[in-house]
UniProtKB/Swiss-Prot annotation:
Amino acid composition bias (Pro residues), ranges on this chain: 15-36, 87-111, 121-137
Ranges of the Extracellular topological domain: 245-275, 297-306
Protein name listed in UniProt: Proline-rich transmembrane protein 1
Any Gene Ontology CC annotation: synaptic vesicle membrane
Topological category with respect to the lipid bilayer: Single-pass type II membrane protein
Task of the protein: Required to maintain a pool of extrasynaptic AMPA-regulated glutamate receptors (AMPAR) which is necessary for synapse development and function. Regulates basal AMPAR function and synaptic transmission during development but is dispensable at mature hippocampal synapses. Plays a role in regulating basal phosphorylation levels of glutamate receptor GRIA1 and promotes GRIA1 and GRIA2 cell surface expression.
Name of encoding gene: PRRT1
Species classification: Eukaryota, Metazoa, Chordata, Craniata, Vertebrata
GO BP: any one term: learning or memory
Basic residues biased stretches: 40-49
Annotated region (Disordered), positions in chain: 1-142
Compartments where found: Cell membrane; Synapse
Assembly mode: Component of the outer core of AMPAR complex. AMPAR complex consists of an inner core made of 4 pore-forming GluA/GRIA proteins (GRIA1, GRIA2, GRIA3 and GRIA4) and 4 major auxiliary subunits arranged in a twofold symmetry. One of the two pairs of distinct binding sites is occupied either by CNIH2, CNIH3 or CACNG2, CACNG3. The other harbors CACNG2, CACNG3, CACNG4, CACNG8 or GSG1L. This inner core of AMPAR complex is complemented by outer core constituents binding directly to the GluA/GRIA proteins at sites distinct from the interaction sites of the inner core constituents.
Length: 306
C-alpha cells in the first residue's frame, strides 16, 4: 500500500497532460540474464523489426522503470512509432550527410520582381504581318564631307509590342543612321545619288555676341614718323630712344617675333609721347620767360629815363 501511494493521490486532480500514467510499483533488482538471452533478445528485436514498430519506455510516478518491468508491460504502457519496412539499409552515398543530420529542402531562388508599376493594362502586341520588312542594304553615294555614326557597336532587337517581360534585360535595336557633317563654307550637295548637287545661295546665319570670328592679327605700329618729329622739334634725347625702339619693331616683324614687336612698339610710343610732352613744356616755358624778360626790359628803360 505504501508503494502504491508514492504517486499522486486520487483525490488530487492530475496536473500532467493525458494520458495519465498510473502509479507503478518500485523497481525490483534485475535478475541475471540467462545464457539464451542474447538469442531471445535478438529474436525479440527482430520481431519488432518485422512488425514495423519500436517500443519506448515511459516515465512513471516513481521514476524510470527497469528493463524487466518494461518488457513485462509490453504494449500496454508503451508508445509505438512507425518504422520503415525491414530491409537492408543502403550504403551512404557520395556527398551525403552523416547519419543523424537533418537535410533541409533547397528552396528555389526568389523570382525577379519589377519595381516599375504600370497604371493601365499593357497594349496588345501588333500582329507579325503588320511589321514592315527591313529595307535591303543599298550602295548609295555619300555626300562630300565627314560621316559621324550615331551609335557604335551592335545591340539586340526590341521585341514586338514595345515592352520587355520582367526578369530580362532590355535590348535596343541598332541605329544605322549617319549624320553628314559638312565643313564651314562648303555648299550642300544633295539630290539623288549620282545627280548634281544643289548649291545653297543663302547667306550664313547671323552670329551671336559669343561667336566672334577670328580675324588675322595685325602687326604692331612702329611709330617711326612721330619719333623723328619729336626728336627734331621737341626733345631730342628721348626722341632718339623712340627712333631706336621703332627700328626694333621693324626688325622683330621681319623675323616673325610678334611678342617682341609689340613690346618695342609700346616703348617707342611712350618715348615719343615723352619727347612731345617735354618739347611742349619747354616751348611754353620759353615763351613765358621771353615775355617776362621783355616786360622787365621795358620797365628798366622807363626807370632810367629823365
Amino acid at each position: 500500500m505504501s508503494s502504491e501511494k508514492s504517486g499522486l493521490p486520487d483525490s488530487v486532480p492530475h496536473t500532467s497532460p493525458p494520458p495519465y500514467n498510473a502509479p507503478q510499483p518500485p523497481a525490483e533488482p534485475p535478475a541475471p540474464p540467462p545464457q539464451a538471452a542474447p538469442s531471445s533478445h535478438h529474436h525479440h528485436h527482430h520481431h519488432y523489426h518485422q512488425s514495423g514498430t519500436a517500443t519506448l519506455p515511459r516515465l512513471g510516478a516513481g521514476g524510470l522503470a527497469s528493463s524487466a518491468a518494461t518488457a513485462q508491460r509490453g504494449p500496454s504502457s508503451s508508445a509505438t512509432l512507425p518504422r520503415p519496412p525491414h530491409h537492408a539499409p543502403p550504403g551512404p552515398a557520395a556527398g551525403a550527410p552523416p547519419p543523424g543530420c537533418a537535410t533541409l529542402p533547397r528552396m528555389p531562388p526568389d523570382p525577379y520582381l519589377q519595381e516599375t508599376r504600370f497604371e493601365g493594362p499593357l497594349p496588345p502586341p501588333p500582329p507579325a504581318a503588320a511589321a514592315p520588312p527591313p529595307p535591303a542594304p543599298a550602295q548609295t553615294a555619300q555626300a562630300p564631307g565627314f560621316v559621324v555614326p550615331t551609335h557604335a557597336g551592335t545591340v539586340g532587337t526590341l521585341p514586338l509590342g514595345g515592352y520587355v517581360a520582367p526578369g530580362y534585360p532590355l535590348q535596343l535595336q541598332p541605329c544605322t543612321a549617319y549624320v553628314p557633317v559638312y565643313p564651314v563654307g562648303t555648299p550642300y550637295a544633295g539630290g539623288t545619288p549620282g545627280g548634281t548637287g544643289v548649291t545653297s545661295t543663302l547667306p550664313p546665319p547671323p552670329q551671336g555676341p559669343g561667336l566672334a570670328l577670328l580675324e588675322p592679327r595685325r602687326p604692331p605700329h612702329d611709330y617711326m614718323p612721330i619719333a623723328v618729329l619729336t626728336t627734331i622739334c621737341c626733345f631730342w634725347p628721348t626722341g632718339i630712344i623712340a627712333i631706336f625702339k621703332a627700328v626694333q619693331v621693324r626688325t622683330a616683324l621681319a623675323r616673325g617675333d610678334m611678342v617682341s614687336a609689340e613690346i618695342a612698339s609700346r616703348e617707342a610710343r611712350n618715348f615719343s609721347f615723352i619727347s612731345l610732352a617735354v618739347g611742349i613744356a619747354a616751348m611754353v616755358l620759353c615763351t613765358i620767360l621771353t615775355v617776362v624778360i621783355i616786360i622787365a626790359a621795358q620797365h628798366h628803360e622807363n626807370y632810367w629815363d629823365p
